[in-house]
Amino acid sequence: MLPKNCTHLGECNSDCLTRSEIQALFREVINTLKHTMNTENVCAHMLDIVSFERIKEYIRANLGHYTVITDKCSKRKVCLHHKRIARLLGIKKIYHQEYKRVVSKVYKKQTW
């Protein structure tokens, strides 16, 4: 079943969560680990594959516990976005390179 566009009136879906909100979620997860004194590799960069793997596993294991609350939507369950989050966690390039790749892919064939 294809997801419907979010109307912000009730159930919010995968089209509703922005990349910046996902990045903020990653920062909050790392802050939670620091707060609980679980500090192993919390300073690891996302591209440091070996060191950041424990953080990735923690995020994956706890997706069902996270909810994003903003002024446009009161509750957005993060677990509904698991594929998108997995893709972001799997990026092996800096974001500038990833942005250039996506933009060139999207706008390679101009239709307007």
Swiss-Prot record:
Disulfide bonds: none annotated. One of its GO terms (biological process) is regulation of DNA-templated transcription. It holds the Pfam family Baculo_LEF-11. InterPro entries: Baculo_LEF-11. Keywords: Transcription, Transcription regulation. Involved in late/very late gene activation. Belongs to the baculoviridae LEF-11 family. This is Late expression factor 11. It comes from Rachiplusia ou multiple nucleopolyhedrovirus (strain R1) (RoMNPV).
